[in-house]
């Protein structure tokens, strides 16, 4: 193929949004949670979805993760419109997530917790169907899991029981479990929640470094926490996007200031 044509195809691929959700509406028992919400995540960027409590952030996160079925709206991945994903389709698409509640098995070791993530990934068919059924595969599964732990600087915790970890360490392990599938998109629900300033600084630096390999979507309540790490922000209030754009512009938007001061949207 002509090198110029190849370069054009690669450029088009890069410019195509990795993930798009458009005109998303969700209601629960007649109560509107989201109305006409849109979101776009590009390749190798960090996008934050922020807003006051009850703004609809987690509902949007759950819709993309297959935990909530929207009443209306479209979902596209790599430029192709698809049906809204189910939770068991996320790994196949290349999406991994961590939830606010972390969700580690307390009586298992850290390594065992991450290996569970690898086993779930194997069941998608993206790894050999026989993966994990013999000693060789189990060793590979363990290696993959240890690599994920080392990426979050938690390799030394591998043999610790999950219920003995500090809260910041449980956050790291939960991210390692998501990274074991080597996703294109990592979705993080309140990654800085409950962390002190030093741990937040570490988390933001770590997330920033991930963008050489993937895109990251963060749902967060506190705007200041994500300002330094996000390329772009979407601000929700009362189930609608009230502002979006680069972080500095969003921070100065009067609608955003009003929403966070509680004086209305």
Where are the model-predicted features located?
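Helix-to-loop junction immediately C-terminal to a conserved catalytic motif
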Residues: 65
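Helical segment within the ABC ATPase nucleotide-binding domain
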Residues: 200-212
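Conserved ABC ATPase "signature" region
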Residues: 125-157, 205
């Amino acid at each position: 193929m002509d090198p110029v044509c190849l370069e054009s195809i690669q450029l088009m691929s890069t410019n195509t949004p990795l993930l798009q959700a458009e005109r998303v509406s969700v209601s629960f028992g007649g109560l509107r949670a989201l109305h006409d919400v849109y979101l776009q995540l590009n390749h190798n960027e960090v996008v934050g979805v922020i807003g006051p409590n009850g703004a609809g952030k987690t509902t949007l996160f759950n819709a993309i993760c297959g935990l909530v079925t929207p009443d209306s709206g479209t979902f596209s991945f790599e430029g192709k419109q698809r049906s809204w994903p189910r939770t068991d389709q996320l790994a196949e698409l290349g999406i991994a997530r961590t939830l606010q509640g972390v969700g580690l098995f307390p009586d298992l070791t850290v390594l065992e917790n991450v290996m569970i993530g690898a086993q779930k990934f194997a069941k998608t068919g993206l790894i050999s169907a026989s993966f994990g059924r013999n000693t060789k595969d189990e060793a590979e599964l363990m290696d993959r899991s240890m690599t994920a732990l080392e990426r979050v600087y938690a390799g030394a915790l591998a043999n610790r029981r999950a219920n003995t970890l500090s809260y910041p360490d449980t956050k790291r392990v939960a991210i390692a479990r998501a990274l074991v599938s080597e996703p294109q998109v990592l979705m993080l629900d309140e990654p800085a929640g409950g962390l002190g300033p030093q741990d937040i600084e570490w988390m933001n630096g770590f997330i920033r470094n991930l963008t050489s390999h993937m895109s990251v979507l963060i749902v967060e309540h506190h705007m200041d926490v994500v300002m330094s790490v996000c390329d772009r922000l979407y601000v929700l209030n009362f189930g609608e996007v009230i502002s979006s754009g680069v972080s500095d512009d969003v921070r100065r938007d009067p609608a955003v200031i009003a929403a966070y001061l509680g004086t209305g949207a």
